Structures are given as C-alpha cells and as structure tokens.
Amino acid sequence: RANNFTIKATVGRPLIARILNIKLIMKIYIIRHGQDDASVRGGWSNTSLTALGIQQSNKLADELFQNQSEYNIFKIYSSDLKRARQTAQIIADKLSVPIEFISDFREVDNGELAGMDNYLAEEKYPNLYWRKLNWDEHYPNGESPKEFYKRVSNAWEKFIKEISHYDKNVLLVTHGGVINIITCIIDGKEYSNKNKNQKIPSAEIAVEAEV
C-alpha cells in the first residue's frame, strides 16, 4: 500500500466536470523504479535492475494485483530508461495492462557521467554533484537544473491534459529527480536542485494524485 512517504494531492478536475460540478476523479500513482546499480552514476545511464530491484518490483506488482479493485489501474506510463522500463514491464505483465513510454520523464541528463563508475566520475569530475550545480550550469554534455525542470514540468502539464478524461487510474514509473519536481509542482512550491529532498523509496507508491 501507499507508505508514510506518499504525497496525496488534487491536481485539478477536467473543465466540463468543474462547470457541471460533477465529481470526476481519477488517480495517478507515481513510483520510482526498483533498485539499480548504485556503483555507477545514474541519470541517463541504462543500468538494469538489481536482483533486489526485481524483487521489489514483483512485490509491488503482487500488491497492485491483489488489490485491483482498489487501485483500478488500466494503463502504465513510464520513463524509457531501462531500469524504469523493467519495473513497468514487471507490473504490466502482472496486471495485464499496456505501457506507454515517455522519454521526457527520464531522470536528469547527466551527460558524460551517465553510467560512469563512481570512483572514475570522482576522479574525472571531482566534487561534481547535482546539488552543487548552479541553476544554469550544465553537466558536461548534459542538462542544467533549469533545463531539467522545464522538461519535466512541460511533460507533466501535457500528461495531465492527456489523462484528465480517464475514468480509471494510471501508474507512472519514473525517477527520484522527476518525482521531486512533480511534488513541488503539485504542492505549489518553488523547485531548486539545491533543496534537500526526502529520499524516495524504490518500487513503492511515492505520490498519489487525484485529477
């Protein structure tokens, strides 16, 4: 079930529902992918799930399957990076629902550091970490915090418009950095990469938003 971390929020009902004062509510369940290889830099790396990550994903899939009437998920949306795809596929297979991949819900593009061993990244790019970047400062051949925020916020706005007419719920499989931005948008808070964000667990429902 949704754990203590879960953020519950109302994003906004479709216009026709607001005009007629009809209570049309569907939910978006947002999860971070299962555990992947922590010995390399993540971002746009195409690392696979670890054995534990697969186990975590199967556990969530079982929970969603056993409580289908409660969750009522008819479609999964996912980042197209491998660790998210694997997580989404495990759940989709269990629930027998389709997946749509959205590349704009990828983690931050960390350019040259993507998939690089941690020790090598520290050697080549000492002390280069997400929270230390300035707003307009890029990862080498990658994104700046400003660009990452713009990409995700635009994708989220488009996503909400696309699903707002659904009468069943959807699941979004994405990444920690993306979830941090989405929660700021939902809560109406200013986003900064320098914020100390709460650690988001793997393969558990992190956000439950009503539309």
Which functions belong to the PLM regions below?
Residues 2-14:
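Extreme N-terminal basic, low-complexity initiation segments
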Residues 15-25:
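Short, Lys/Arg-enriched N-terminal segments with co-localized hydrophobic residues
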Residues 28, 74, 165-176:
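Generic beta-sheet signal
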Residues 28, 32-98:
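Active-site-proximal alpha-helix that buttresses catalytic centers in soluble enzyme cores
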Residues 48, 94-154:
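Phosphate-handling substructures
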Residues 67-72, 159-168:
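Glycine-rich phosphate-binding loop signature in dinucleotide/nucleotide-binding domains
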Residues 176-180, 204:
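GST superfamily/GST-like fold recognition
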Residues 187-211:
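Domain-level recognition of soluble alpha/beta enzyme cores
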